[in-house]
UniProtKB/Swiss-Prot annotation:
Sections of the chain in a coiled coil: none
Highest classification ranks of the organism: Archaea, Methanobacteriati, Methanobacteriota, Methanomada group, Methanococci
InterPro entries: LysR-like_Sec_metab, LysR_subst-bd, Tscrpt_reg_HTH_LysR, WH-like_DNA-bd_sf, WH_DNA-bd_sf
Pfam families cross-referenced by the UniProt entry: HTH_1, LysR_substrate
Record's keyword terms, sorted: DNA-binding, Transcription, Transcription regulation
Family: Belongs to the LysR transcriptional regulatory family.
Organism per entry: Methanocaldococcus jannaschii (strain ATCC 43067 / DSM 2661 / JAL-1 / JCM 10045 / NBRC 100440)
Record PROSITE patterns: HTH_LYSR
This protein's record includes keyword NADP: no
Protein name: Uncharacterized HTH-type transcriptional regulator MJ0300
Amino acid sequence: MDPKISYFQTFIVASKTKSFSKAAKRLGITQGTVSNHISALEKYFDAQLFLRTPEGVDLTPEGKIFYERAEKILDLLNEAKLLMRAIHENPEGIIRIYASTTPGEHILPSIIKEYKSSYKNVDFEITITDSERCFKALDEGLADIAAVGYLKNKNYEYTIIGKDRLVLIVPPNHPLAEKGTAKLEDILKEDYIDREEGSGTREAFIKALNDKGYSIMDLNVVMRLGSHSAVITAVSEGYGVSVVSEIPAKKAEDAGLIKIVPVVDLDVVRYLYLVKSRRPKNPSAVKSFWEFVTKV
């Protein structure tokens, strides 16, 4: 069996004190344990390390060879420990994040800005895609963290970073905008701008439809687009209506591009999540960022 680090420490102290009993007292262990540690080392190296004397113990020639190297080994281990601690306290490198549109464009930037005010040597590489591809990137080792609009399953380590409401958006001059409210059946009558498959927004809306006894097939989908901004542009230009995240929708409404219309019989609220890879490429930086986010 390979020797433990504690055996090296016992050997060094016994060498310096020239006594197993003094070594035991200094280390807070029994003299028998000291003897066992030394015996294990002697067995491993197939060499006698100490000579027993009336006064205590002295190093053999083999023991002197090992003493010099054991001290270096312990010094290197302590140095490595200090360097690792420094990395944990001052992480550096890149954290790779795959993010769906809403958390990636509207939630993460402020979190990252606050984090980087304390950890300037950590940089972020963010890829915006749909939630399904975010999970795939995690599983394939392409992402250290994913920011998504739904949980694929509960086997991932995750934390909630926000809450989002889905809202109906229509062109500014649309009859529903003038009416001021809508019902789910009104959406079913309109040309609908859908998000791409794998979108967290789309998944949440489909679930809401299913809960009401409908399906995606009941919508008159005229096009599918890959981001909220593309959907908002299509709606503003009169191609149809859509259900999107309230966060970008409010910005677009303030800019006069679309109108948000409350749907009296539909209330879709979802959580936004950060999900951590089981095998991050930069463990220290990811650990630091994760602890920062979960403590906020």
